[in-house]
């Protein structure tokens, strides 16, 4: 019996706890390399947020709901709506900021392989299909030269890159921000 050390449960308990800790940290760190999420309201000045909260609900059967159509068939923000609905006011501290924002694509241009290289990112699905479109300070023009194959506009995306305050006029809608995307990916179930 001399020289025999009884086996202790301590090392196995320690190893199990260590393994569990590593697994838990590993699952939490899966997205640790990503920037924290930027909320869409961070792109809107406080004064616009207050005006939006005070605005009556839009009746989609009203004359204002018909929007303003351009010669090319695009739908623009209607001037008959409260000013906040076509506000181009921005948040200066967001300029040249690296962000990660979630939203839905409205494709504008594609490459030869059919990948979207230029699109609006909007806060809710079908935003530029429904009338009226979001305010310009709630639309982001995304430039993504690598392109992303989009199966439909109801696919939520994460877009990471440098946000710029930039007024963009387009036949479909106007935007107050543009983003040079470094990474665009589809939101996965594990993100939720």
Model-predicted regions and their roles:
Residues 11-12, 31:
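Low-complexity, intrinsically disordered segments with a bias for serine/threonine
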Residues 8, 15-18:
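Positively charged n-region of N-terminal signal peptides that target proteins for export
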Residues 18-27:
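Sec-dependent N-terminal signal peptides
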Residues 4-5:
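Acidic, Ala/Val/Gly-enriched low-complexity intrinsically disordered segments
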Residues 32-192:
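OB-fold and OB-like single-stranded nucleic-acid-recognition modules
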Residues 9-10, 22-23, 109, 167:
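Residues at secondary-structure transition points
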């Amino acid at each position: 019996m001399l020289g025999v050390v009884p086996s202790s449960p301590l090392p196995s308990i320690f190893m199990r706890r260590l393994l569990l800790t590593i697994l838990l940290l590993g699952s939490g760190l899966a997205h640790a390399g990503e920037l924290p999420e930027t909320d869409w309201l961070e792109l809107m000045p406080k004064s616009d947020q207050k005006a939006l909260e005070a605005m009556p609900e839009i009746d989609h059967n009203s004359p204002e709901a018909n929007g303003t159509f351009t010669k090319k068939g695009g739908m623009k923000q209607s001037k008959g709506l409260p000013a906040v609905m076509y506000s181009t006011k921005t948040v200066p501290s967001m300029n040249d900021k690296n962000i990660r924002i979630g939203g839905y694509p409205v494709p504008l241009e594609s490459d030869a392989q059919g990948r979207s290289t230029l699109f609006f990112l909007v806060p809710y699905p079908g935003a530029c299909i429904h009338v009226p479109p979001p305010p310009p300070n709630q639309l982001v023009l995304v430039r993504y030269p690598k392109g992303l194959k989009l199966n439909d506009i109801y696919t939520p995306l994460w877009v990471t890159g440098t946000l710029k305050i930039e007024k963009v006029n387009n036949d479909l809608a106007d935007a107050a921000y543009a983003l040079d995307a470094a990474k665009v990916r589809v939101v996965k179930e594990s993100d939720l």
